[in-house]
Regions:
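Active-site-adjacent structural elements that line small-molecule/cofactor binding pockets in enzymes
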Residues: 1-282
Length: 282
């Protein structure tokens, strides 16, 4: 299994560039950052971890832009993959976002993986004009439209939420296919969506025993006529035992995502030293 690092970016603590550089130097395979454009003060949507409107971490209100963060990380590194856990594409203009991601892939030498979510904070999405009951449809259209812009010399798209006429959009990504991983609670609807439109699944923190869900995803994958196997990335929520690591590997996990502490830069680097030693990647 590969090992990635997740930095909950905010306006304090270690910078994305320094964290990505430290992760790369210690042998980690990928660097992830999240996205929230803003958090409405009054919300109806419950947070998945608290079950209420209470946020479990004040960094939700202070999150840095993910693509700017990854651009600084790209400039400080040469090997580590650059990703999001997760981005919310529906909160951006799709043509502009396609340009941003293609540019990042171009300038980083083809190191981008898009981790995307449907969005639990429906109040946040509503401020961007996304109807709560149409989140999956909107994301599908964004993905289809951006892939057209990334792969076609003259791209056009005509959907319910995304429309643009024939246009030129360069640069194209270095990668002929930009990987798309969906971070969402595992279930039949999500797995069917992934099997049709994405390359893999990223678990939520509450999903640690994934054996049954991984099998269900592979069944949906085969039913959709997909070849190979889906990418499965586990967001590690606590300090796992060797048995947990073995169980994830047996279930088909391809990558484990380890969160960084909300701490000063030196403390984060010391944590990375300990983590790299514990999982024996150095």
């Amino acid at each position: 299994m590969r090992h990635g690092i997740v930095l909950f970016t905010c306006d304090r603590g270690i910078t994305p560039a320094r964290a990505a550089k430290a992760a790369e130097e210690r042998g980690f395979d990928a660097f992830y950052v999240p996205e929230h454009t803003h958090v409405p003060v009054k919300r109806e949507a419950a947070h998945p971890r608290t079950g209420t409107g209470t946020l479990p971490d004040d960094r939700y209100k202070r999150t840095l832009d993910p693509w700017v963060s990854l651009a600084t990380a790209a400039a400080a590194t040469s090997r580590i993959r650059l990703s999001t856990a997760v981005a919310l594409p529906a909160e951006s203009d799709p043509v502009t976002l396609a340009k941003t991601i293609a540019t990042l892939d171009h300038l980083s030498g083809g190191r981008v993986t898009v981790g995307a979510g449907f969005g639990w904070n429906t109040d946040e999405l509503a401020d961007h004009g996304v109807p709560a009951g149409k989140r999956r449809t909107v994301l599908r259209e964004y993905v289809e439209a951006m892939r057209a812009l990334w792969t076609q010399d003259e791209a056009a798209y005509d959907g319910q939420f995304v429309k643009f006429g024939p246009c030129w959009a360069f640069p194209k990504p270095v990668q002929t296919h930009l990987p798309l991983i969906i971070g969402a609670g595992g279930g039949p609807q999500t797995f069917a969506w992934i099997a049709r439109h994405a390359d893999g699944w990223m678990t939520t923190p509450g999903e640690q025993d994934i054996s049954g869900k991984a099998a269900a995803l592979r069944q949906a994958w085969a039913a959709a006529g997909r070849h190979g196997i889906p990418d499965i990335r586990v967001l590690v929520a606590a300090k796992p035992s060797p048995g947990d690591l073995a169980a994830w590997a047996a279930a088909g996990a391809t990558e484990l995502l380890w969160g960084l502490p909300d701490a000063p830069a030196e403390a984060v680097e010391a944590y990375l030293d300990r983590l790299a030693g514990r999982i024996a990647i150095r």
